[in-house]
């Protein structure tokens, strides 16, 4: 035996080294379940209204409309409504995304779906969001100053102990073919991690913004 070459590692009479790809060694927290997300409170920084007093509803005067959802697979089947055409479903905003589009080197096992499950976001900066008491005229005059947000709880709160090191996501740019857009007209995507307030109205009161109490 050669030095530092264990017995039983030969292939075709030569010492062979196997490199493990550590498949399954990573743990992940899937955040795509739309039912786990709800309307966010006013961020502590970076948006209009962050510096408003706690008992001042003007903190939400720049909240715009945001929708989060998944597209029902029925729209891609023979049961889809007749008024929806193939051209409609080919638009980037609504088309299906396939796994090999994001992970071209990934092999699919037999029976595995080739469709990538996605969470879709639709932001309307010129439309008022929920709990926005700002007069409509002054709201639409400043769409570049508006914002929207959603929030959810995480099952793992100790990122160090769980060895959570980064956020991994894939974003489909639906504006790449719009020549009228400039860098100044595009928005920002911000992630806030930590202890997040659930006081949507930011009035310091338990108003059940997420619905009426059960009793």
Question: What is each stretch, according to the model?
Answer:
Residues 1-215:
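Surface-exposed, low-hydrophobicity segments enriched in Gly/Pro/acidic/Ser residues
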